[in-house]
Amino acid sequence: MNKVKKLMSWNAFPALLLFVILLGINGVMTGGLSVSFFRSFISTNAGAICVAIGVTATILVAGTDISLGSIVSLVNVVIVTAFEKGFSVPQAALLGLLTAVLCGMFNGFVVGIMRVNPLLATFATSIAFAGIALWILPYPGGYIDFTFGDWYLGNMFGIIPTPVVLIAILVLIWIFVMKLPVGLHIYALGKDVKKAYASGINVAALRFFVHTFAGLAAGVAGICISANICAGSPTVGSAMSMNSIAAAVIGGVSLNGGIGGIWGGIFGASFLSILISIVVSANLSSIVQSFIQGLILLIGVTVSIAASDKEIKTKIKRAIGGKR
């Protein structure tokens, strides 16, 4: 019983529950859930999950990063250009990853060292990165070696789908960081910036790190998307930044910082992805699709915030019990 209560009090539980419910609905609509469905789901949505992991890290320190979608687009066009220049699959992937990490480091420098507001800083860099992507590849197209796609859709270590391994690498890096003193410092910074400064925590270094990690996550996302579509587009990640923030909130991550974790981002992104899949498969008009997605997203965010906010929980219990 204690384990059940502990699970239900977990910040990411509402997102996990919503995902499982929609997964069941999707199974009913499609006649069942198969291994091929899960492989297709993870290969299609691994990029969104990776971006959600990255933005969650920045939100935990009471910040955000709305440039990750533009970084994904930039990675995509860099990989396309690399293949057109004759680079091999590993070389193109590493070049794309390096580009993303450098973008993340630049964000970390502006936010952490220069102390520019994270929202304003990453809004500016988002426009800059998107502009660079358009300069490199002005229109969709380009060439990506199909062996890149074959590698992505295959298995690593014999049985594990490649997208799962790529996501797991990010998760393991974050878990390792959380085991170190810096993990506690990240949550301390998110809960109270002034106290973090007063206690001697290196705030600039922490913010630099989380934005660099977010850049790495966006780089992995760019690799996933590029390998999955085997084509280039300078706007492929344009909608990912805001969706990833919504995913984090649905996953119980407080926008004020210091509450939640990357599992919330993962389950929140999974929920959004399965929601989009269900709405699209219903063959509704685009207007109705957008309305339903927005409505369910609003409900999901509201439920998650209500479930993770103790004050709101208390008010709901009082309202239900008729107490004032």
Residue map of PLM features:
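Cytosolic-side transmembrane-helix boundaries in multi-pass membrane proteins
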Residues: M1-V20, G24, V171-L172, K191, ...
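Short loop segments and helix-boundary regions at transmembrane helix junctions
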Residues: K3-L7, L102-I144, K179-P181, I245-G261
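Structural signal for alpha-helical transmembrane segments and their membrane-water exit/capping regions
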Residues: L18-S34, V61, A133-P138, I175-P181, ...
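Inter-helical junctions in multi-pass inner-membrane proteins, predominant
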Residues: M29-F41, I136-P138, V177, V210-A248, ...
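Transmembrane helix-bundle core of multi-pass membrane transporters
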Residues: G31, M114, P118-L180, L206-F209, ...
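Transmembrane alpha-helical segments in multi-pass inner-membrane proteins
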Residues: A218, N228, G232-G294
